[in-house]
Amino acid sequence: DIKKFFASVDHKVLLSLLKEKIKSENILWLLEQVIHSFETEKGKGIPLGNLTSQIFANIYLNELDKFVKHKLKIKYYLRYADDFIFLSEDKESLLQYIDELKKFLENELKLELHPKKINIRRLDNGIDFLGYIILPHYILPRTKTKKRILGKLKEKMGSENFKQSLQSYLGYLKHANAFKLSRDLKNHFLL
């Protein structure tokens, strides 16, 4: 995980990457207006949840993807937004990758790995990714995720958009082996 990714995107780096790909001065001007319309600190930050921010994030982190695949030559790598994992049979290799990744992020993209979210674990303990624990034959929602879902639903109970929230969480749980939890949520909140 990258520490405060959306708040830390460097405008100069992002614009430089866009200029490599886009030749139209008009489009570049428009994108520059969008980028400079939001700042968390001088010259940094893109708004969380904005459609353009999702595109900008993928363009920005494509540099990370290329570094991981072509320079580090990590065979098993997966990224979704600013969350990513890579796998190796060798713990020493993982530690070396992390060290090189930190340097690349700081020097090239002006980003920082979140120190509390670096996690080295055995594959048979599952992969903790995007709120799920992914195991060889099944996927579970993370305990913290289950607690957060329950808390959010209790907060929204009786609100106008409660059913939408419940349906959204049930949709999220469909990607996991969480039949019992889904059934319990329906029974508890819909009765």
Kindly label every feature range from the protein language model:
Residues I2-A81, I85-L101, L105-E108, E112-R121, ...:
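Conserved polymerase palm-domain catalytic core
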Residues S37, E92-D99, L113-L191:
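Right-hand nucleic-acid polymerase module
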